[in-house]
C-alpha cells in the first residue's frame, strides 16, 4: 500500500471499530476506515440494519469515495459485506484496488436461509465465539449494548444470498487461519470463484480472529 491508499474494513458480527485496534500500526502507511453504521457495531441504540436491502441503501447514502486507491476488507461476516460493497461500487462504475477477505465464509455459502435467531440464541453464540468477555455478557446492559447489535448482524447475514451477486472484477486476497475452528479452509478456496481477476491465499495461525495479533508487517502484506 501507499500513503494515499484507503482501507475500508467491515467488522465481524456484532463488533465495531475496536475490533481493528491492531491496525493502528498502519498510521502513516494508509488511511483506515472502519465501516460501523447503526446495526453494524455502534452501541448507541439506533435501529439496527437487518436486511441486505437496508445495508445497500445505507452504504450508498453514507459512503464517500476517497481519492486514491481503495481497498475493501472484512473479517468473518464483514468479508461478505465487503463483497456486497464491491458489487455496489461496480454497479456505479467504481472499482476497488483489492478485496481482502479475512477468515470469512465465501459468498456462495450465504444462501438466504432463515435460522430463527433471537436474543437468547445470539447471546449463546457470543459465548461460544469468545470475542466478548463473559463478564460483559453478564452485565445488566449487555442485551441493548452488545447482544442486540449481534442479533441485528445475524439477521442481516441470513438475508444475504451470494448467488444473487455478480462475480467482481477486483483482485481478491483471502486470509485463512489454519487453526480456525469457525470457518473452514475450504471457504478460502471458494473465494477464488468470487472474482474474475487474480486470487491470492495467505495462510496464518491465530484462529478465527487472527487479525487481532497482526503487526505492521502482517497488515502491509495482506493489503499489498
PLM features: what roles do these ranges have?
Residues 74-78, 82:
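Gly/Ala-rich beta-loop-alpha elbow adjacent to hydrolase catalytic centers
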Residues 168, 174-176, 180:
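Short beta-strand/loop motif that positions the catalytic acidic residue
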Residues 37, 98-110, 129-131:
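Active-site nucleophile loop of the alpha/beta-hydrolase fold
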Residues 34, 38-68:
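Active-site loop/oxyanion-hole signature of alpha/beta-hydrolase fold enzymes
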Residues 147-165:
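Active-site nucleophile elbow and catalytic-triad environment of alpha/beta-hydrolase enzymes
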Residues 181-187:
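Conserved alpha/beta-hydrolase "acid-adjacent" motif
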Residues 201-217:
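Catalytic histidine-centered segment of alpha/beta-hydrolase-like enzymes
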Residues 1-40:
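Short, surface-exposed "cap/lid" segments of acyl-processing enzymes
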Amino acid at each position: 500500500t501507499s500513503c494515499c491508499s484507503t482501507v475500508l474494513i467491515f467488522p465481524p458480527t456484532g463488533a465495531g471499530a475496536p475490533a481493528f485496534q491492531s491496525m493502528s500500526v498502519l498510521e502513516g502507511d494508509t488511511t483506515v476506515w472502519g465501516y460501523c453504521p447503526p446495526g453494524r457495531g455502534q452501541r448507541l441504540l439506533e435501529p439496527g440494519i437487518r436486511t441486505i436491502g437496508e445495508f445497500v441503501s445505507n452504504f450508498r447514502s453514507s459512503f464517500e469515495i476517497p481519492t486514491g486507491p481503495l481497498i475493501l476488507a472484512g473479517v468473518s461476516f464483514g468479508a461478505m459485506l465487503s463483497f456486497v460493497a464491491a458489487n455496489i461500487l461496480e454497479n456505479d462504475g467504481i472499482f476497488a484496488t483489492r478485496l481482502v477477505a479475512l477468515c470469512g465464509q465465501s459468498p456462495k455459502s450465504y444462501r438466504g436461509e432463515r435460522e430463527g435467531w433471537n436474543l437468547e440464541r445470539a447471546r449463546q453464540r457470543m459465548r461460544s465465539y469468545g470475542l466478548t468477555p463473559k463478564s460483559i455478557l453478564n452485565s445488566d446492559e449487555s442485551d441493548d449494548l452488545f447482544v442486540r447489535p449481534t442479533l441485528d448482524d445475524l439477521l442481516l447475514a441470513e438475508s444475504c444470498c451470494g448467488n444473487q451477486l455478480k462475480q467482481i472484477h477486483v483482485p481478491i486476497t483471502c486470509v485463512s487461519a489454519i487453526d480456525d475452528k469457525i470457518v473452514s479452509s475450504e471457504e478460502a478456496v471458494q473465494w477464488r470463484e468470487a472474482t474474475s481477476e487474480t486470487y491470492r491465499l495467505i495462510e496464518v495461525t491465530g484462529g478465527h480472529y487472527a487479525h487481532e495479533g497482526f503487526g505492521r508487517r502482517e497488515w502491509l502484506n495482506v493489503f499489498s
